[in-house]
Amino acid sequence: MTSTEDTPASKPETRRETLGYWGYRTAEWLAISLPERIGRRVFETLGRVAYRRLHGVRATVAGNQARVLGADPTDEHVDHATREAFELYARFWFDAFRIRTMPVEEFNQRLVMVDVENIDRALEAGKGVVCALPHMGNWDAAGHWFGANGYRIAAVAEELRPPRLYDLFLRHREELGMRIIGLTKDGHVGQQLKQLLSENWLVALVADRDLTGRGIEVEMFGETRRVPAGPALLSLSSGAPLVVCPVYTRDDGWEVRIGEPLEFERTGVMREDVAALSRLMAERFERAIAAKPTDWHMFQPAWPEAGSTAAVPATPAEPR
């Protein structure tokens, strides 16, 4: 039997956790309080400062960008792309908090939804849709659009410390119209997602980075890496189609491109089919990232040979 002292929620906050919480609270306040033009400049300036100061993270991002661009990490073009990646990631945070206060009419005008009929047709079967996304553009904006336009959408989020940081992002995304399922180790998450799919929900999973080390090996940009098996497994076990939905940052908004449901010839062996569908998903991710590499918010080593170069933590409570 586990005592309350052993549970993560019962442990006192560390100083670093407290600072992290207030850092995000401050970012939220700035994004909501400042005039948009000024706020965006402030966040992009912070992105440029991070680019100059966080040398280890910059090296990680440069390594990822170099792989995508097919260039040497020291190439001037890679350096420019790396700097832009920092600016766009800062823009991600500004937009993520800002859109919560934006009138729906204005928001709908600023988000371009391409080929949403692919999802509408898939929903006609009544089995829901699994939406797989790379860490691109602003997935909160995509989720908000669906929630604001009559779709029922759920996402999975990793539980965080301190608990009030998790609560902050839970509240934030629920206000955007998403239902958030906490990622736990009891195995119930998959059951909850299957139930939602059976009720014809959309389930959004940000799925271009494997956190377990046990994901599916795929080839992206000429090198092997891993992606989580979850989207493919959930799709195959529930009967819900799997679509890839990359999001791109535009000058004054965002663009979401809805792909067609992924199809392949099944073997009937679940393990092999999960691997095949995951590889197909990775191919679509590769195309999406290649279309705008600097909009890929990959601030951790994306390929094994990148080693243990310093990286920023995973996006707090990000949908998976």
Regions found by a protein language model. Give the residues of each.
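Conserved nucleotide-cofactor-binding alpha/beta core module
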Residues: 82-83, 87-201
